[in-house]
Amino acid sequence: IITDPVFEKNYGPLWFGPKKYVESPLTLKELPEINLFLLTHNHYDHMSIRTIKNFPYKNAEVLVPLKLGKYFTRNGYKKDKVKEMDWFDTIKINDDIKVTMIPAQHWSKRWIWGDGNTDRSLWGSFLIEYKGKKIFFACDTGPAPFYKDLGEKFGPIDLGFGNIGAYNFFPIINEKDKSVFHTNPEELLSLMQDLKVKKVIGMHWGTAILSLEPIWEPPV
């Protein structure tokens, strides 16, 4: 399973954009066989057209939010393997694995200039169920009251991955270390408690400068 892969050295439409401080540990050619490709949303630090084009396992099952399937089918992926999902849709991959897309407090936009493409495609987190175990892979998300309802519906969850970086946009956002669309470490733990997640791994930090907090601050 691979999630939101970006194998380029920077996030952006061309050669420019935030540069990675930490490069990918593998190249595309070094990837082991991938059977399931999950994409949470279309922001440049999560969806790379170059990675999609050059991905070596185009027979993999691909699960994406609504309106993002075209980026795969036009780049050589089989149409019957690319499935767009709405919130609360569940897809059975095989007898052992099923995947549900669940809501996130986020947004979508592909082009930098103008607002014409804002929220034209969906975004969402993934709940992966495998032989009685549940793994939550979060889309970028801010805190939201609906996570308590999701915890009642889907919990308990064995393992959760969630963002702990890109939370300081002060003074663009009035309150320092608070973001509507991302969580700081303390907010992530609260969110995961609402979801009834047993163990949590913080991600989405230390790779590139996407906001105003020091890049290595989140785990501190």
Features from the language model and the residues they span:
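Residue-level marker for buried hydrophobic side chains located in beta-strands
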Residues: I1-T3, I135-F137
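Pre-active-site segment of Zn-dependent metallo-hydrolases
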Residues: I2-N42, I49-N54, S108-T118, A144-G155
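Short hydrophobic/aromatic-enriched beta-strand-loop microsegments
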Residues: T3, E61-L63, K79-W87, D158-N163
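Divalent metal-coordination and catalytic microenvironments
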Residues: D4, H41, S48, V99, ...
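Active-site metal-binding loops of divalent metal-dependent hydrolases
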Residues: P5-F7, N42, L68, A104-H106, ...
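Glycine/Thr-rich phosphate-binding loops of Rossmann-like dinucleotide-binding domains
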Residues: Y11, M47, F72, K109, ...
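Cap/insert and terminal regions of metallo-dependent hydrolase folds
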Residues: E61, K67-K70, K134, G142-V220
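Metallo-beta-lactamase
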Residues: V64-K133, V220
